[in-house]
Amino acid sequence: MKHLSLLLSFIFLTSACSEKPHKEKYEANWESLKQYTVPEWWKDMKFGIYFHWGPYSVPAYKEWYSHWMYEDGNKIREYHEKTYGNLKDFGYKDFIPMFTAEKFNADEWAKLFKDAGAQFAGPVAEHSDGFAMWDSELTEWNSAKMGPKKDIVKLMADAVRKQGMKYIITYHRHWLYAWYPTWDKSTDAGDPKYAGLYGPYVPKGSFKMGEKVPTAYPDDKFNQEWLDRLNELMDKYEPDIIWFDNKMNIIGEKYRMLFLANFYNNAEKWGKEVVCTYKAKDMAEGSAVLDLERSRMSEMKPFPWLTDDSIDWDSWCYIDAARYKTTNRLIDFLVDVVSKNGAVLLNINPKANGEIPSETKERLLQMGQWLKLNGEAIYGTRTWNVYGEGPQKIVEGHLSEFKNSEAVAQDIRFTQKNGQLYAIALDWPEDGKLTIKTLKKGNPYINNFESVSMLGCNDNLEFNQSDEGLVVTFPTEKPCDYAFVLKIN
């Protein structure tokens, strides 16, 4: 019996030793990462909200304040020195105690986002300034230990999920490299004891804008810290979506691939599907979701894409002199993007004390009212045969939204869902009649029309198909204040 027990023990140990370690689905190379497929839930997502909020909100003078305040000759440096004093005595770090967020309420914010019609929402987890908005064990420069003394990322994760939305975090840390003049001993940024916030020493002239080739690249230590913070965010908060700012290509390719493989493999363990977004050529095409900034596509795309834009024409964070986009502009932008297989991530601008400006609330709630009435033509829809028609010509390219004109009634966008076609007029026709040229007699798409109605109106509308198009007579009263949705059977 003793010999039998020894034999069984030997067999068990031999078997255990011969077992191969579990092979994860994704490996840290682009070929493997291109196996990723976009989740169906993401294709249904059309509208999300995030916010730029941090110590840079205190001076209320744009989110790049922390960089420009150290730049010779910049008007923000002149403003800073006049208002707060010289950079040796009052640097960016000194805004952190002033970032108190005493009026911040995560549940109220999340409810506002939900009421605005958002399907996903979340914070900038770390901006270019290097200040972490979560309770990090990797840096003391974080919102749980300083400033608000709150784990903003966790509080928002709990509140957003309570509202039934997907949770997004955005990450901009790669911009920190050479963001501050750590070579300049005449400022606090050049003091090594603040390197945990301002980053490593870099030679003068190292900073370059996102589209320019830098003269120096981050070393492995910076790259590893970039990755470690991401891994900490993943482990602590299990985000559904991780969004990256541009310029991520300065991070070593190995570290970018390690992150993405880790995120996708973690999602397998979490039992859910996730989304990562990237800009330009920062990741391999097909490995994640492409994101644009303050711009949109001019044509329909076969792949889902995202664009992020701010509610303010000039800034991503709160500024006293904000120029708010109109609700009409925001809704037209959303409709156009959705018709081309895209989704919108709208940035808003909380004040340093945690208040959301009344102008922002007003626009969000107006968007929510419109989506409550017309959401069936937006949420869960897919592209049709063509995205639309009309005189508006969209200019493509980074930050090109400033060049795009306002839409008119003849600008029409199409979506479809469950065999139902929607035609969305971006304004109300002056004569009360809309001609949809795409649906003229003999068009290659659809010629048998049973009825045409407008969302928000009870009665069917009069229509006539001619050689010029499908001519629809609008109701006498508008059902809403913005884009108008025709439901075509």
Where are these regions (language model features)?
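Bacterial Sec-dependent N-terminal signal peptides
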Residues: 1-22
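Mature catalytic domains of secreted/periplasmic carbohydrate-active enzymes
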Residues: 20-489
